[in-house]
């Protein structure tokens, strides 16, 4: 939950902090240079009126370039920040949906340890009646393990017939009559 919040805060900080390099490059490439550098050094106007007009034109050029960063910031918001916010919202919705379905699935599939109901359902006629389960009705761990052992032994006997392994009776007979195999 912290990671999406951190990503959102990071995106907002990036959007709100103006980038200084872009403004510098715009001023450098905009062609707004002082009038003095465009004129040859041979001609200098010593009058105060000329200096005032140069400063006014320079201020007007600088003020006209100040509107460009605001437009660039608006373009940045439209092109980067809005899709980024939509992507974060999409990821958050996927995370919430995944957790919702995960919780729903765990509620539907109860675990085998301790979650069994204390009531057992029996059908009596057309009605389902819930009857409490008593200790005598539930098999003990030893009974369950013995049943599993019997199943395993039966499967071993069936497999032994197919693989031509000696059965238990054949092994016992061979153990009782060792003199037959020695002579």
From Swiss-Prot:
Subcellular location: Membrane
Keywords: Membrane, Phosphoprotein, Signal, Transmembrane, Transmembrane helix
Disulfides per UniProt: none
Predominant location category: membrane
Membrane topology note: Single-pass type I membrane protein
Listed InterPro entries: TMEM154, TMEM154-like
Cellular compartments per GO CC: membrane
Ranges facing Extracellular side: 23-75
Stretches in topological domain Cytoplasmic: 97-183
Membrane spanning stretches: 76-96
Superkingdom: Eukaryota
Pfam families registered for this protein in UniProt: TMEM154
Identification of the protein by name: Transmembrane protein 154
Region ranges (Disordered): 163-183
Modification sites for Phosphoserine: 179
Signal peptide stretch: 1-22
């Amino acid at each position: 939950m912290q990671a999406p919040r951190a990503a959102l805060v990071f995106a907002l900080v990036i959007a709100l902090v103006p980038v200084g390099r872009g403004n510098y490059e715009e001023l450098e490439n905009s062609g707004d240079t002082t009038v003095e550098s465009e004129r040859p050094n041979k001609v200098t106007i010593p009058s105060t009126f000329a200096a005032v007009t140069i400063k006014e034109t320079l201020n007007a050029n600088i003020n006209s370039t100040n509107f460009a960063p605001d437009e660039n910031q608006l373009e940045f918001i439209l092109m980067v920040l809005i899709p980024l916010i939509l992507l974060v919202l999409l990821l958050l919705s996927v995370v919430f949906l995944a957790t919702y379905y995960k919780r729903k699935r765990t509620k539907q599939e109860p675990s085998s340890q301790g979650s069994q109901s204390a009531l057992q359902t029996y059908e009596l006629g057309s009605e389902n009646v819930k009857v409490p389960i008593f200790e005598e009705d539930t098999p003990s761990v030893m009974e369950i393990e013995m049943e599993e052992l019997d199943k395993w032994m039966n499967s071993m006997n069936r497999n032994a017939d197919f693989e031509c392994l000696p059965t238990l009776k054949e092994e016992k007979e061979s153990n009782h009559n060792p003199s037959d195999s020695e002579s």
